[in-house]
């Protein structure tokens, strides 16, 4: 499984990159707005920091507008992936982008049919939202399994990005169930590094070391 960080904050991206595990970045209009910066300038800045995929989302709701925005975003850098919502117009835009050789990430996926349609339209990635499905009592992880099975059965090359990741269990289970990528907030990435027994082990090693050196 590959790891993307879900943020538009430069310091968070740098911190994630220092861990040596960062394969890409996903952003959305809300994350960029929170930073209070120019959208295109921030996307360009992120693309220079990270060699992998950088998802930048269009805000138009009609296919024509999405295509124009997407072309502008794709021109920023080779590693830009245009993020498109799962709608009828979104599918039209994905088809157009595929014909232009522009990578796409179809977002706000909540069902198998949505993922299948996006893949058939030519999406590079689909992003099922785990946490938001959990919020309404549905099984987001089962959706990952179902999408992975169907993509495998039909030989579809579209990759699955586990999105709306809330905790480490989402990450480990999504990996087991066939997600190619997890896009994760930095605080959850940090949670992945920890375990109570790791902390206890470090404390014991240090205590034993200090005891041995004091006695000498």
Swiss-Prot record:
Highest taxon in the source lineage: Bacteria
Transmembrane segments: none
Active site per database record: 83
A GO term, aspect molecular function: aldehyde-lyase activity
First-tier enzyme category under EC: transferase
Primary site of residence: cytoplasm
GO BP terms, alphabetized: carbohydrate metabolic process; pentose-phosphate shunt
GO cellular component: cytoplasm
Keyword Lipid metabolism appears in the UniProt entry: no
UniProt cross-references to InterPro entries, sorted A to Z: Aldolase_TIM, TAL/FSA, Transaldolase_3B, Transaldolase_3B/F6P_aldolase, Transaldolase_AS, TSA/FSA_arc/bac
Coiled coil: none
Database matches in NCBIfam families: fsa_talC_mipB (TIGR00875)
Membership in a protein family: Belongs to the transaldolase family. Type 3B subfamily.
Protein name according to UniProt: Probable transaldolase
Lineage: Bacteria, Bacillati, Bacillota, Bacilli, Bacillales
């Amino acid at each position: 499984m590959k790891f993307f960080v879900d943020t538009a904050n430069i310091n968070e991206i740098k911190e994630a990159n220092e861990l040596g595990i960062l394969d890409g970045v996903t952003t959305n209009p809300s994350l960029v707005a929170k930073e209070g910066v120019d959208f295109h300038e921030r996307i360009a800045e992120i693309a220079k920091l990270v060699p992998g995929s950088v998802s930048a989302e269009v805000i138009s709701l009609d296919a024509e507008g999405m295509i124009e925005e997407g072309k502008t975003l794709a021109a920023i850098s080779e590693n830009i992936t245009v993020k498109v919502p799962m709608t009828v117009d979104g599918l039209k835009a994905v088809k157009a982008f595929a014909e232009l050789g522009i990578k796409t990430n179809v977002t706000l996926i909540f069902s198998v049919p949505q993922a299948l349609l996006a893949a058939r339209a030519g999406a590079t990635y689909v992003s099922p939202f785990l946490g938001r499905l959990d919020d309404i009592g549905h099984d987001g992880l089962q959706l990952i399994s179902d999408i992975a099975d169907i993509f495998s059965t039909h030989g579809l090359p579209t990759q699955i990005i586990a999105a709306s990741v809330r905790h480490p269990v989402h990450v480990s289970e999504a990996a087991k169930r066939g997600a190619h990528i997890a896009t994760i907030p930095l605080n959850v990435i940090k949670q992945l590094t920890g375990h109570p027994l790791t902390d206890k082990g470090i404390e014991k090693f240090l205590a034993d070391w200090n005891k041995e050196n004091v006695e000498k």
